[in-house]
Amino acid sequence: MREVISLNVGQAGCQIANSCWELYCLEHGIQPDGYLTEERKKEDPDHGFSTFFSETGQGKYVPRTIYADLEPNVVDEVRTGTYRSLFHPENLITGKEDASNNYARGHYTVGKEMIDQVLDKVRRMADSCSGLQGFLVFHSFGGGTGSGFGALLMERLSVDYGKKSKLEFCVYPAPQNATSVVEPYNSILTTHTTLEHSDCSFMVDNEAIYDICRRNLGIERPSYENLNRLIAQVVSSITASLRFDGSLNVDLNEFQTNLVPYPRIHFPLVAYSPVISADKASHEANSVQDITMSCFEPNNQMVKCDPRNGKYMATCLLYRGDVVPKETHAAVATLKTKRTIQFVDWCPTGFKIGICYQPPQQVPNGDLAKVNRAVCMLSNTTAISEAWSALDHKFDLMYSKRAFVHWYVGEGMEEGEFSEAREDLAALERDYEEVASDSLEEEGEEVEY
């Protein structure tokens, strides 16, 4: 089997994971105690979920996941919550003091004490897999544990499991509503560290998801649970083809092959459709054409940036539910006639399609309506560099006055790391600009190298 291990780091990572496992259990008919529901036992045994769950001798299913946080509060909620008997208690790892929003604490001082314990559990989990496919790492960019410990974990995974794919789901700091002052520092330091270790990073930003919840679901003041359930739908769509069968399956390595034209340019933009509230569901048609088109509207995208300002390099459309290949080809043909959707000229085809027949599931009494088909779009577009430039600008404002830098230096960081990380991100922005401007005339002049 092709197993996947999920690693959840820090508060954001652990809370997103809670919503994801809640949804996986519903999709596979697994109860909160890890045993199959009665209806599920009657059906044909489906081995798809062994990518995400391991089975014990008693017929209990245990998630292949590890929770790691430097402070115990969030993971304690898992230990006492509804799903407490689902997870293996040894795989819920917590420290005693948190990283206090400081990348250096998560990466150097506090994180160093915990990393070996986490890697030991990863090693045990990997040993029990027959064909480990790769890792999904969930963390935020802004927090101390998510940024610092997340980066440390990615570095160490590269050393121990060099060839395995590592996909990140990162919560990117929202442009307007920040949860901490030093978010720009943490984000840029962690991006610099993980840039060479991550194969593909799916970014979501809280502000964009707040807006989707407000606009499409009519929730006036969305909680983190509302946001995470929406993110869980996206993660579920991305991993559905690993867990269910479909006519066009996509595995972890295929994402990289189809979405990442150059190793550094690995930050696809995520969009999901349809997001409709239960009371509006009956009035929407939701044809394949409609949901495909709505993915290209900035309103349905999970990061605040405008794709109309950039060019698409590659796009992956993952359909699930009642969808046949013929309809998807028709939808893509229509997309290609739209003038607003511009592809770079060196990538003429640009669409990878995946279809999974399992319809999307919704959490009972949740915000999302039951729909019979959905699509998740992952697109590598040069517009996402807008997100970087906004963050770089904030970093520059603080760093020009060396504000808050002493907290990082006091935890054993060199001040040079800041400027090194900032230069790396400036280079990343330039990479995106070059890709966008690489028209064929310029190619002719640059043949020397």
From Swiss-Prot:
Its main location: cytoplasm. Tubulin is the major constituent of microtubules, a cylinder consisting of laterally associated linear protofilaments composed of alpha- and beta-tubulin heterodimers. Microtubules grow by the addition of GTP-tubulin dimers to the microtubule end, where a stabilizing cap forms. Below the cap, tubulin dimers are in GDP-bound state, owing to GTPase activity of alpha-tubulin. Pfam families: Tubulin, Tubulin_C. GO terms for molecular function: GTP binding; hydrolase activity; metal ion binding; structural constituent of cytoskeleton. The active site is at 254. Its cofactor is Mg(2+). SUPFAM superfamilies: Tubulin C-terminal domain-like (SSF55307), Tubulin nucleotide-binding domain-like (SSF52490). It catalyses: GTP + H2O = GDP + phosphate + H(+). InterPro entries: Alpha_tubulin, Tub_FtsZ_C, Tubulin, Tubulin/FtsZ-like_C, Tubulin/FtsZ_2-layer-sand-dom, Tubulin/FtsZ_GTPase_sf, Tubulin_C, Tubulin_CS. The record marks 449 as: Involved in polymerization. Keywords: Cytoplasm, Cytoskeleton, GTP-binding, Hydrolase, Magnesium, Metal-binding, Microtubule, Nucleotide-binding. Belongs to the tubulin family. Dimer of alpha and beta chains. A typical microtubule is a hollow water-filled tube with an outer diameter of 25 nm and an inner diameter of 15 nM. Alpha-beta heterodimers associate head-to-tail to form protofilaments running lengthwise along the microtubule wall with the beta-tubulin subunit facing the microtubule plus end conferring a structural polarity. Microtubules usually have 13 protofilaments but different protofilament numbers can be found in some organisms and specialized cells. GTP binds at residues 11, 71, 140, 144-145, 179, 206, 228. This is Tubulin alpha-1 chain. One of its GO terms (biological process) is microtubule polymerization. It comes from the Eukaryota. It is found in: Cytoplasm, Cytoskeleton. The lineage of its organism: Eukaryota, Fungi, Dikarya, Ascomycota, Pezizomycotina. GO terms for cellular component: cytoplasm; cytoplasmic microtubule; microtubule; nucleus; spindle; tubulin complex. Mg(2+) binds at residue 71. Signal peptide: none annotated. Its EC number is 3.6.5.-.
